[in-house]
């Protein structure tokens, strides 16, 4: 098992051994790729890296350490998750979640959400995607591709994490609160 670390400013991804936390290697990315969030497809040994700079989704082959594909989506892409062979990608510019078929790289759809979706967390057991937006948290059913719940908030949600054991949602805000 591995730990993958995004190094935004050095434009690289570090790989550590999970059990020892020993450094194994760095994968240097192209000059215009700044990894912030990414997801791993362990079966295919691929990393999907959304770009907030150029609206591209980069596909990194972890076995050879090279970008093997890029998919033009557009906008300011900020977060990504893999669920049921589909990629869910947040786009702050269009206030939407873009859905892509991982096997074909074809678009499946776009779900409009509230203002500035940035972070999200996926509950793959219940097929739910929880999206942090400014002044709300949106819950999306990943099977029907529809919003099943909206929670209005009086804070600017930025990142979000589910605690499935406690059945709680944690979110950090733009002004540094949890």
Language-model features and meaning:
Residues 1-178:
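Predominantly soluble domains enriched in secretory-pathway, periplasmic, or organellar proteins
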